[in-house]
């Protein structure tokens, strides 16, 4: 696959039109807004930076790197172990459901894009979108850092678009937020990918509480 094709594939994976349900979940933000924890744009940016620093950089990216390497080596046992670890790090039923739902949706795309994906790997990808992204990145020969950029941009854009609906704020403010959050992501991503095993784990108790409370929130825009 040429470099141009690989870049276009990365754009497709980061696209908001990718039908994996990324815009259906707020990861607790909806309850945090109702509780008054995130009343404005500045508070939203602080909230999202904290989720990135204490969650995405310490759980998602380190585990994505391990899943990618397991896929490179064809080590299904290691990939299963790290996927189970990822699900264990999702601290609420809502977050685990999101992970599995997005994984199942991505696996359906994977079946169309790569119908020769072996059944054990396809079954694993149904449990987590990270596993599917890792397998596909290896199959398409896209390097880990580039896949991590696509993954991060998709996560940032989904979070900001949830903020537009909930906080709320306008599209111009949203684009400024995406710019600043992407700069922070790009600066810290290499360190996150190199996280040692012993440092994997989240430290976002308020986000976990918000997600748990969102499960029974009376009026909701986002899934639970």
UniProtKB/Swiss-Prot annotation:
UniProt keyword terms in alphabetical order:
Chaperone, Cytoplasm, Nickel insertion
Give the family, as the similarity comment puts it.
Answer: Belongs to the UreF family.
Note the subunit structure: UreD, UreF and UreG form a complex that acts as a GTP-hydrolysis-dependent molecular chaperone, activating the urease apoprotein by helping to assemble the nickel containing metallocenter of UreC. The UreE protein probably delivers the nickel.
Q: What does this gene product do? A: Required for maturation of urease via the functional incorporation of the urease nickel metallocenter.
State where the protein is found. Cytoplasm
Kindly provide the name given to this protein in its UniProt entry.
Urease accessory protein UreF
Matching entries from InterPro entries are given as: UreF, UreF_sf
Q: Does the keyword Ligase apply?
A: no
Broad class of where this protein is predominantly found = cytoplasm
Q: Name one Pfam family in it.
A: UreF
Gene Ontology MF, one: nickel cation binding
Which HAMAP family is this protein grouped with? UreF
Q: Which GO terms describe its cellular component?
A: cytoplasm
């Amino acid at each position: 696959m040429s470099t141009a094709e690989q870049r276009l594939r990365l754009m497709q994976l980061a696209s908001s039109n990718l039908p994996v349900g990324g815009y259906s979940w707020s990861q607790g933000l909806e309850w945090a807004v109702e509780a008054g924890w995130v009343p404005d744009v500045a508070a939203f940016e602080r909230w999202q930076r904290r989720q990135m620093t204490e969650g995405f950089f310490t759980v998602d990216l380190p585990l994505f790197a391990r899943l990618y390497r397991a896929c490179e080596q064809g080590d299904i046992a290691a990939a299963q172990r790290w996927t189970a670890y990822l699900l264990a790090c999702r601290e609420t039923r809502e977050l685990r459901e999101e992970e599995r739902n997005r994984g199942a949706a991505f696996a359906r795309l994977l079946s169309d894009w790569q119908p020769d994906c072996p059944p054990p790997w396809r079954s694993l990808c149904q449990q987590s979108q990270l596993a599917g992204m890792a397998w596909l990145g290896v199959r398409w020969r896209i390097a880990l850092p580039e896949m991590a950029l696509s993954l991060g941009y998709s996560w940032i854009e989904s979070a900001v678009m949830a903020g537009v609906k909930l906080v709320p704020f306008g599209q111009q403010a949203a684009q400024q937020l995406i710019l600043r959050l992407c700069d922070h992501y790009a600066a810290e991503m290499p360190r996150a990918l190199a996280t040692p095993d012993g440092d994997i784990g989240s430290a976002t108790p308020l986000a976990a509480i918000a997600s748990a409370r969102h499960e029974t929130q009376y009026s909701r825009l986002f899934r639970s």
